[in-house]
């Protein structure tokens, strides 16, 4: 059988034997030998070159080529998809193409000789969900929620990023409630038909603003009281407070950015941005469009 992906990807993923067929060199998926009258699959093929044996073909790996189409707000798990294809081993080699707006991708954990070619097409994206904005409060305005990471991997991968890989933005902090004191003057009838003025202070409670939702897919929800939801490309604005000592809510963070604290840091705490990639040390190479547009940290 032929391999399920292009020749150029096969060259990157490596360890595919080629044969000459009808005048053309072609990569093959399986190599078989006849042993005792029976054809058997070969696990590995070595050749002797310059006095050393070199591995040129890996025959145990599950080969795949899968494209994500149609926007999805559910995490894509490569392990779950491969299991659905009927493979239960731990050796894989293949290509995954993101052709949509995808909330999170998990490449999983596989054998040390497994490899994935990850392509994000132009104008497409892997994005974490944005963090929700915090709610206003008197003594304990709530914190903004953290944004989600975009890509997780514990398998070696080649990155061809023509789109965006972005952690979700952190939610803005909720602003504290407060009070406002106003001077009130009243005119009343007093002795002998005269009018007298009385002046006194009135104190009323005022509401703080909610935190804005962080950017992501989907964007984070607002924390109420005038705050805005996060969108796929930007964080929501924090809500405005009433007068006096109440404080505005913090803005939601953009893609890969932390949210903002409440006005004068009086309220909850901002949410932090999700990582763009958790598993950066597993990156083998940048191919095609290379590392591309990554918003948020690349860690581990």
Regions found by a protein language model. Give the residues of each.
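Exposed extracellular interaction/assembly regions and N-terminal maturation sites
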Residues: 91-93
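Enriched but not universal
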Residues: 1-88, 283-300
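Beta-solenoid repeat scaffold
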Residues: 110-121
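Glycine-centric low-complexity/flexibility signal
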Residues: 95-100, 121-282, 289-300
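Intrinsically disordered, low-complexity segments enriched in Ser/Pro/Gly/Ala and basic residues
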Residues: 1, 5-7, 49-51, 113, ...
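Generic detector of isolated residues embedded in canonical secondary-structure elements
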Residues: 44, 117-119, 276
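N-terminal extracellular ligand-recognition/capping segment immediately after the signal peptide
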Residues: 66-76, 97-110
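Extracellular and analogous surface-interaction loops
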Residues: 83-89, 110-111, 155
